[in-house]
Amino acid sequence: MGTHDGYESAGELLRALAAPLRIAIVTELGGGARCVHELVEAVRAPQPLVSQHLRVLRGAGVVRGARRGREIEYSLTDEHIAHIVADAVSHAREPRRPARVAESPALSGDPASINPG
């Protein structure tokens, strides 16, 4: 197993989630399966736009659709995705802290500060 196993898949997942509306959709689906009209109401976006974003999420394997009568009900393929999104949203809502100065001489970027011996 290489050290980069899973990085490509993680990158694809994060790219699929890289839109505020898709984050909102995944957040809603974290609470359970929803039909398109329910998602439209919840995220307050036009139906064609919600459907377009659902296609992206379905193509990335984030959501799946199942027919429920005349409608398609969408759900997350993996509950971990809801946690990833919830953590990202929570982190984004935290107050920004100033960047920390490197604590280690090796991290400062100054080659003279690194003791080779």
Region spans (language model):
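Alpha-helical residues within the helix-turn-helix
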Residues: E41, Q52, R58-G59
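A generic alpha-helix propensity feature with a strong bias for hydrophobic helices
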Residues: I23, L49-S51, S108, I114
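Short, structured secondary-structure boundary patches
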Residues: L13, A60, R70-I72, A86-S90
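N-terminal helix-turn-helix DNA-binding core of bacterial DNA-binding proteins
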Residues: G2-P48, R68, I72-H80
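Juxtamembrane/membrane-water interface recognition
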Residues: E28, V56-G59, R96, R100
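Amphipathic alpha-helical dimerization/coiled-coil segments
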Residues: M1-D5, S9, E79-G117
